[in-house]
């Protein structure tokens, strides 16, 4: 029964194929397939090319690769074998990625238009993956590009036999055939050297013989040129051909050719082979396993991309120099702070801190660009779904120009975003391009080359002296500077008589208080001092607040400040009125300043005047002193007893607060009427809202399709108007081009006619000259023959 070869690849078959390729190379696929009982040579080659080759990239696709794939698919449709090496993937990977991009675009468009149908369950529409997934009973048409199937625990008999045979054949590197081939190569080389030596000796003896070693139907590649195409007789310019041949000759390396002809498996030493054969212990197996693991690591390292170490130039400023610069800057800041209070010293010290340049610090953002990948996918789907050209109509609108990858070359078009380099373009500053250079050769708005912060113009010409200056120019410049300084000093006003009073200098025995002030304070001490100062300020601010806030007593959550202030102003007693107003003002300020989580405050109170802490303490002391007096305490007790007796004299507490019953009944009825009206209005609002929701759903059901259609038509109208505008621009451009070409055609024709007439004239003159010379030659030949015949 014949065996049908093919099917899913297993891990064992992949490992055997790798080992066979490492031994037999990439050209002897028949030998490689002889180790795999279930695979043909074509399938072995496809498996290596599509999956096992270390050069295959199996990582996720990047955006640049997707853009390049769609661009090449637009240039070379369905030519996946040509596109694959350009993209750096296999043809199967390119095709699968291309189909996946189209499927994702289609699914995204369906989701946007709401055509997905009910979600979930069997009612959902099948996706592209569901359509391409194999069903039970179907065979994978391309198993070479799929991952290997895990090995089973119990192998079949044919699999065990295949594995044992592959192990035996791959381990046999010292077989009879290998020895015979090596011996034949050595004999062939010695025979060739003997023939060359014999020919050299005969040539030295004066006998030249021709070495003919080829058989019938063969070619001697040392003497003949294979595939030679002799050039036609005549005179031709062969400069370009000679240069091309010279480049090809330089590129040819005979050593690589010899290495390609050799087999990859090198013969090992006989001593090592005998040692492995005689070693029956477990150490040989352990060493072989370790060696195999090491070789596997080497292969994996070769398969992975080699990353070179990042080589950076040496820093221009060392760490010590950077520390010196920082110390100099700190010293300058300290001196500026010390001299900041004195007007006289402040004018003599400039600000040498860092200055931010005109160029932006952050990298400029990239300009908004269109999604080239999405536009190319839309173009492909539009070209695929378009109707036949026989039906007529307008062409399919496509994304062209800057919104697509274009047709400029094999690589997609992209806009290069380059970060501006202020060192490469020093004249392109914020004050304008092409400005007039400053005096001294320095660019517009640029800082001097060596002193970027020169406020007193001490090194104004230093940048110009670095380039193109001579000693004479330097002397003239110094002389001009000295004269300018003298003229400025001469223009100063004359000194006035002024009396100065100088303070006495401190004695040497005095304590160095200045040095103590100048010395820096420890950071921990400074932080502790600032924290204590903040705590003292917080305690003082807390003592300035009311006792209600300090003790955390309950406060009103809902407060109407205007009503509270109005009730306080209605108090007739002037003293109690002042107290009531002040209390109302304190309550309002506490409610506004320290709001409760769910509190509600209406109105706005005037801001409290901030009193001095000494006045507050004096007032509190006066209150305590007044309360401490016994007479005041007795009066308070007597007033409390009177108030208690008057309050509890009635039968029911608070009965005096109730008014007339008729008035209360009228107010109750009015309140009930308002509640009923409110409930009726609320019920009407709910019914109206429910009826409106029903009408909205009904209208959406009936007119939803029309709305979508109107939206689509509106979009098409906008696109058609833009296309019409572009067509008008193109028509005007082509009309202008036609007019210019028509005017140029006449001039070109006239010039060509003049050239043809000149060529015809020169040709006639040449023919006439040739005829005259030919007649003279014939006469000379005839005269020579007559003389010769006369002698005979």
Swiss-Prot record:
It is found in: Cytoplasm; Nucleus. Residues 705-780 form a coiled coil. InterPro entries: CDC5L/Cef1, Cdc5p/Cef1_C, Homeodomain-like_sf, Myb_dom, SANT/Myb, SANT_CDC5L_II. GO terms for cellular component: cytosol; nucleolar peripheral inclusion body; post-mRNA release spliceosomal complex; Prp19 complex; spliceosomal complex. Residues 111-189, 224-307, 389-410, 490-536 are annotated as: Disordered. Keywords: Coiled coil, Cytoplasm, DNA-binding, mRNA processing, mRNA splicing, Nucleus, Repeat, Spliceosome. Pfam families: Myb_Cef, Myb_DNA-bind_6. Involved in pre-mRNA splicing and cell cycle control. Belongs to the CEF1 family. Associated with the spliceosome. This is Pre-mRNA-splicing factor cef1. It comes from Aspergillus fumigatus (strain ATCC MYA-4609 / CBS 101355 / FGSC A1100 / Af293) (Neosartorya fumigata). The gene is cef1.
């Amino acid at each position: 029964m014949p065996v049908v070869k093919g099917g899913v690849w297993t891990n064992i078959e992949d490992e055997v194929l790798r080992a066979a390729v490492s031994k037999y190379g990439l050209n002897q696929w028949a030998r490689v397939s002889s180790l795999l009982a279930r695979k043909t040579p074509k399938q072995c080659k496809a498996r290596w090319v599509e999956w096992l080759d270390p050069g295959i990239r199996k990582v996720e696709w990047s955006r640049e690769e997707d853009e390049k794939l769609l661009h090449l698919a637009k240039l070379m449709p369905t030519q996946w074998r040509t596109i694959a090496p350009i993209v750096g993937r296999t043809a199967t990977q390119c095709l699968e990625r291309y189909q996946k991009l189209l499927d994702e675009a289609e699914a995204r468009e369906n989701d946007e238009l709401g055509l997905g149908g009910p979600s979930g369950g069997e009612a959902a529409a099948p996706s592209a993956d569901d359509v391409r997934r194999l069903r039970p009973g179907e065979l994978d048409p391309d198993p070479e590009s799929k991952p290997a199937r895990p090995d089973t625990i119990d192998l079949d008999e044919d699999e065990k036999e295949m594995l044992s045979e592959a192990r035996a054949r791959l381990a046999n590197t010292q077989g009879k055939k290998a020895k015979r081939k090596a011996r034949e190569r050595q004999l062939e080389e010695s025979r060739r050297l003997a023939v060359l030596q014999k020919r050299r000796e005969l040539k030295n003896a004066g006998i030249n013989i021709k070495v003919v070693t080829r058989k019938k139907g063969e070619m001697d590649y040392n003497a003949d040129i294979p595939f030679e195409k002799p050039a036609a007789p005549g005179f031709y310019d062969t400069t370009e051909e000679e240069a091309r041949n010279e480049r090809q000759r330089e590129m040819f390396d005979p050593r690589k050719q010899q290495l390609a002809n050799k087999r990859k498996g090198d013969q090992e030493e006989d001593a090592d082979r005998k040692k492995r054969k005689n070693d029956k212990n477990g150490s040989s197996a352990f060493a072989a396993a370790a060696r195999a693991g090491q070789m596997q690591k080497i292969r994996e390292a070769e398969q992975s991309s080699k990353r070179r170490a990042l080589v950076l130039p040496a820093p221009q400023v060392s760490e010590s120099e950077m520390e010196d610069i920082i110390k100099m800057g700190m010293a300058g800041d300290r001196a500026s702070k010390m001299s900041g209070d004195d007007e006289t010293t402040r004018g003599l010290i400039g600000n040498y801190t860092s200055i931010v340049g005109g160029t932006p610090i952050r990298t400029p953002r990239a300009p908004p660009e269109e999604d080239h990948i999405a536009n190319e996918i839309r173009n492909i789907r539009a070209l695929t779904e378009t109707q036949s050209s026989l039906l007529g109509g307008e062409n399919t609108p496509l994304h062209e120009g800057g919104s697509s990858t274009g047709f400029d070359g094999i690589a997609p078009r992209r806009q290069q975003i380059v970060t501006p380099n202020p060192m490469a373009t020093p004249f392109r500053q914020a004050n304008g391009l092409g400005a007039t250079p400053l005096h001294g050769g320095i660019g517009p708005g640029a800082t001097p080359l060596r002193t970027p912060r020169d406020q007193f113009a001490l090194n104004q010409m230093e940048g110009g002296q670095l380039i193109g200056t001579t000693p004479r120019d330097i002397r003239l410049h110094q002389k001009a500077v000295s004269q300018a300084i003298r003229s400025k000093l001469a223009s100063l006003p004359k000194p006035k008589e002024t009396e100065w009073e100088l303070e006495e200098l401190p004695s040497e025995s005095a304590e160095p208080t200045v040095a103590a002030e100048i010395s820096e304070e420890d950071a921990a001490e400074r932080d502790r001092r600032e924290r204590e100062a903040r705590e003292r300020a917080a305690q003082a601010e807390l003592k300035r607040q009311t006792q209600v806030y300090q003790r955390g007593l309950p406060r009103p959550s809902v407060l109407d400040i205007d009503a509270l202030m109005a009730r306080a102003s209605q108090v007739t007693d002037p003293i109690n009125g002042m107290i009531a107003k002040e209390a109302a003002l304190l309550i309002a300020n506490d409610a506004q300043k320290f709001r409760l989580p769910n509190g509600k405050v209406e109105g706005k109170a005037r801001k409290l005047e901030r009193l001095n802490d000494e006045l507050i303490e004096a007032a509190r002391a006066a209150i305590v002193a007044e309360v401490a007096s016994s007479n005041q305490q007795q009066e308070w007790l007597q007033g409390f007893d009177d108030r208690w007796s008057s309050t509890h004299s009635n039968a029911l507490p608070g009965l005096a607060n109730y008014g007339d019953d008729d008035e209360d009944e009228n107010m109750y009825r009015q309140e009930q009427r308002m509640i009923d009206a409110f409930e009726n209005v609320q019920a009407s609002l709910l019914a109206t809202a429910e009826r409106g929701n029903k009408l909205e759903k009904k209208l959406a059901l009936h007119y939803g399709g029309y709305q979508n259609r109107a939206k689509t038509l509106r979009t098409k109208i906008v696109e058609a108007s833009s296309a019409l505008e572009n067509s008008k621009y193109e028509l005007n451009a082509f009309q202008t081009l036609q007019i210019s070409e028509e005017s140029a055609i006449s001039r070109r024709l006239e010039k060509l006619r003049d050239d043809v007439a000149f060529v015809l004239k020169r040709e006639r003159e040449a023919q006439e000259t040739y005829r005259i010379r030919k007649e003279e030659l014939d006469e000379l030949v005839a005269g020579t023959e007559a003389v010769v015949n006369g002698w005979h």
